Each structure stands twice: as structure tokens, then as C-alpha cells.
């Protein structure tokens, strides 16, 4: 029975992690429209932030070398608590504190059964946009691709 509970918890953690990844990539417009579309908004209280800071980005040459400090990246984060008790966290690259706050709100709403469907709809919308952007970039890259080949020259 413990294994089934652990598997369920692991699936929930993975689902929330994927949701937080999508929220970090969502635009301010997408987040704002989704927030405005919610009718029964709970009260939101800040726990931390939103705040902006720096994190050290680490890298490895070839994926197998020793790690080294590549440089610093600006990040924004926020933590909020809903009036219904859920706590949400939002982290993203850049300095957009409003996006970090909204991402934290949607992370908290995702934990609420009453709002999960609207948050999942936002996740799907962001995922569709990201997939379209990836396809467009792949098509642009394919258009500039150069195929090299070697011709065997006969002896004269």
C-alpha cells in the first residue's frame, strides 16, 4: 500500500513540477487573461516577495566535464497563500515580478480541486504556444540547412 501512495505522490509532484515549468514560460498576458477569467477568486496574501535576485548558472563542457560557473542569471520569485489555505510558488527568469506573483497564484490554485480545471486549461494553452514556437524555429532552421556531400571524381 505504501508503494501505491508513493507512486501517486510522485505523479502529483511530477504534474505540479511540469505545471510550474509552464507557468514560468507563460506570458504576462496569458496569466492576466486566465486570472481575469476566474469568477470565484480567493483572497491572495503574499508570503514572500515578489522579489528579484541573481542565481549562479552552472555548466559542463560536453555534458560530462567538471562543472563550472557559467555566469549569473536574474530571477524573480514569489510565494503566496490563498484564503483557502493553499500555498503557491512562482519562479522565472527575468525581472517581471507581476508574472512571478501570478505564477505563484496559479500554482496555489492548481492545488485546489475547485480551480484545477482552469489552471490545467492555462497549462494546455501555454504548452500549445510553446510547441508552435518550437515548430516555427525548427522550420526556420531547416530552411537554412546545408547538406554536404562528397562527389567521387573519376580518373582522367
Swiss-Prot record:
It is an enzyme of class 2 (transferase). InterPro entries: Phosphonate_metab_PhnG (IPR009609). GO terms for biological process: organic phosphonate metabolic process; organic phosphonate transport. It catalyses: methylphosphonate + ATP = alpha-D-ribose 1-methylphosphonate 5-triphosphate + adenine. Pfam families: PhnG (PF06754). NCBIfam families: PhnG_redo. This is Alpha-D-ribose 1-methylphosphonate 5-triphosphate synthase subunit PhnG.
